């Protein structure tokens, strides 16, 4: 049905069918290895792929297969298993595939979520790609959103009130902390003071500024025990979706943006860089 829509929309008024379509067919794969599933809304099941790939091949100048293993994939095996589904689909449909798009899911590092080095993911993907029954000139695509962007942004919040181990802050579930509230994710935090605190750390939860009881971030977030009203806290690793999902609910949402060039609060890019090249890449 969706393929028919694309063909109709790209057919010229005189009835000429488009000859330059690049089409990627999404296959549904497991999200079992990821912290956030993206398997329910999109993707064709394995038994649907043969007919769909064959029909798409007739309409496409370049045909691809894509998938998404889910957000924050915690093991490289997620991509190896998905590529096996791609292999089976290609063999069953007996079509030429020009593009394999492994989608996103590349992780970042958060408290309680420490994935293997990204290099391990790349090695599994390259090894699987090289063994697929595809043309020598086929392209390998990926969409490394979180892995690239998570480290780039922090939010500095002010503590408005403290009640025991609960801190009331001026950002929350309807701001940059959606994932902390609705998914229960933890993010690195640090107290911003001219002089470091000499008290021990203890776990806190956060409440945001809105009228909604759901504006709650359970954490736990480890901060010095003497943190209180008027203090400022940096919450890091919010570059992936935090700022993009901010709203103005209840009249909140005004922020000041500052460009800083300090190191991120956590990173997966601390090791030496390695260049991985396919055997059919020639350096001139």
Report residues per predicted region.
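Short helix-capping and hinge/turn segments at secondary-structure transitions, especially at repeat
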Residues: 88-91, 130, 134, 164, ...
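Active-site-proximal beta-alpha core segment in soluble small-molecule metabolic enzymes
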Residues: 1-101, 106, 113, 124, ...
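Flexible, glycine/charged-enriched surface loops at secondary-structure junctions
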Residues: 96-99, 137-141
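Glycine-rich nucleotide phosphate-binding loop and flanking beta-alpha elements
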Residues: 2-4, 31, 73, 108, ...
């Amino acid at each position: 049905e969706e393929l028919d829509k694309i063909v109709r929309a790209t057919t010229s008024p005189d009835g000429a069918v488009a000859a330059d379509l690049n089409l990627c067919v999404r296959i549904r794969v497991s999200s079992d290895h990821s912290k956030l599933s993206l398997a329910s809304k999109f993707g064709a099941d394995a038994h649907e792929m043969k007919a769909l790939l064959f029909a798409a091949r007739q309409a496409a100048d370049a045909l691809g297969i894509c998938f998404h293993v889910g957000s924050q994939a915690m093991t490289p095996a997620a991509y190896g298993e998905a590529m096996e589904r791609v292999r089976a689909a290609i063999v069953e449909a007996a079509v030429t595939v020009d593009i394999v798009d492994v989608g996103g899911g590349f992780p970042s590092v958060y408290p309680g979520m420490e994935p293997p080095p990204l290099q391990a993911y790349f090695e599994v993907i390259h090894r699987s790609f090289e063994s697929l029954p595809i043309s020598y000139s086929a392209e390998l695509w990926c969409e490394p959103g979180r892995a690239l962007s998570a480290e780039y942004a922090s939010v500095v919040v002010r503590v408005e009130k403290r009640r025991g181990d609960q801190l009331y802050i001026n950002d929350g579930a309807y701001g940059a902390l959606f994932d902390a509230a609705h998914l229960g994710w933890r993010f690195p935090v640090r107290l911003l003071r001219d002089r470091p605190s000499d008290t021990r750390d203890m776990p806190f939860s956060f409440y945001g500024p809105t009228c909604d009881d759901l504006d709650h971030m359970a954490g736990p977030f480890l901060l010095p025990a003497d943190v209180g009203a008027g203090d400022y806290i940096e919450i890091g690793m919010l570059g992936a979706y935090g700022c993009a999902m901010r709203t103005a609910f209840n009249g909140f949402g005004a922020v000041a943006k500052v460009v800083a060039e300090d190191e991120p609060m956590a990173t997966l890019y601390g090791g030496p860089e390695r260049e991985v090249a396919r055997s059919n890449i020639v350096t001139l």
